[in-house]
Amino acid sequence: MVTSPELKAYAQAARAAARALSTASPRAKNTALLAIAAKLEAQQEALFAANREDLEAAQAAGLSKAKLDRLRLDEKVLRDLRTGLQQVAEMPDPVGEIEGLQIRPNGLQVGRMRVPLGVIGFIYESRPNATVEASALCLKAGNAILLRGGKEAWHSNRALVGLMQAALQEAGLPREAIQLVPTTDRSAILEMCHLADLLDLIIPRGGRGLIELVQREARIPVLAHTEGINHLFVDESTDPGCAVQIALNGKTQRPSTCNSLEKVLVHQRIAPVFLPMLAQAMQKAGVELRGDEATCALIPARPATPEDWQTEYLDLILTVKVVNSLEEALEHIARYGSHHTEAICTNHHAHAMRFLREVDASLVLVNASPRFNDGFQLGLGAEIGISTSKLHAYGPMGVKELTTTKFVALGSGQVRD
């Protein structure tokens, strides 16, 4: 594929900006972050107006309630973004840190210095708040970012990137460090995937189709943020009331997010007690239950189809299965899980430890809601996504995960024998 001159020019400008940003002082970067936060507040009405254009077009196009929820900018979203920017500004700057310094027998001091990755291509769907979060993290880590957002959020993203570029300039940093690809045409995704000489990493964040397209086409390393087909296993030894509260929070607190609960696996010995309690709580919350044959025999639920076990709903729908043992639960998760978030409710220590060891996911929890798979909740500050790839980063990607290390050696005239 031939890259369009316009997109290539944007990538070249990002490359030049990345070189400048890699040597920027922590003070300059933090000044820019705080300026972005101030502009989010000062330009709130203009941002709401741009977002209304996107919401009206999305509603006319028949977008789902879950997608509309992710698209919406309101006072709480902007307040959370401002808080996140302030927290990122307060975090230690990892760039230039030297880790693992050791003195070799010949007196040579060897360590690893943390450095920016360079230029990040961020391909994502209808979440304008991700525009700010991703840009802030890349800025703090000394990276330039080339954003390709979804067409649903075009007006919102343009407004957000415009104010962030103004903040960069005010801080004496290149405005090209944060750029929005000037088209929502799908061909731009393929073009970005082929910019191996200009982009250092691509992070796709969205549905299965987008992730698979980028992984198939990219000539650049990819850190995938895939869908969250997240399970809760309710072990026979658990407190059923506690398990119901965890399931309820996981499903209903914000069902449109990738760390929400989609499936519940219930040990057969506790199912007769737990499932009626679960059904009552979910019915009150407006959640549609689907289940296997054993579940449907115990509570009112729609019979689950084979597709249900491999579907991320991002909606008030929950699929339930009764299993015979911990082993069966582990096998089910290995088959249908998406390596995102998995949880167990149990009072059995050995079962908890086995679940932690054997489940392959970016976050595995014991007696806690899957909604905790989030950069802020895990102490990272904001996140650019939750990596379900194992190389370089696994789990929420904060500032440190957007850097790499190079070896450095400090000598006093040593030569090799």
Swiss-Prot record:
It catalyses: L-glutamate 5-semialdehyde + phosphate + NADP(+) = L-glutamyl 5-phosphate + NADPH + H(+). Pathway: Amino-acid biosynthesis; L-proline biosynthesis; L-glutamate 5-semialdehyde from L-glutamate: step 2/2. InterPro entries: Ald_DH/histidinol_DH (IPR016161), Ald_DH_C (IPR016163), Ald_DH_N (IPR016162), Aldehyde_DH_dom (IPR015590), G-glutamylP_reductase_CS (IPR020593), Glu-5-SA_DH (IPR012134), GPR_dom (IPR000965). It is found in: Cytoplasm. GO terms for cellular component: cytoplasm. Its EC number is 1.2.1.41. GO terms for molecular function: glutamate-5-semialdehyde dehydrogenase activity; NADP binding. It is an enzyme of class 1 (oxidoreductase). One of its GO terms (biological process) is L-proline biosynthetic process. Gene3D superfamilies: Aldehyde Dehydrogenase, Chain A, domain 1 (3.40.605.10), Aldehyde Dehydrogenase, Chain A, domain 2 (3.40.309.10). Keywords: Amino-acid biosynthesis, Cytoplasm, NADP, Oxidoreductase, Proline biosynthesis. SUPFAM superfamilies: ALDH-like. Catalyzes the NADPH-dependent reduction of L-glutamate 5-phosphate into L-glutamate 5-semialdehyde and phosphate. The product spontaneously undergoes cyclization to form 1-pyrroline-5-carboxylate. Belongs to the gamma-glutamyl phosphate reductase family. HAMAP family: ProA. This is Gamma-glutamyl phosphate reductase.
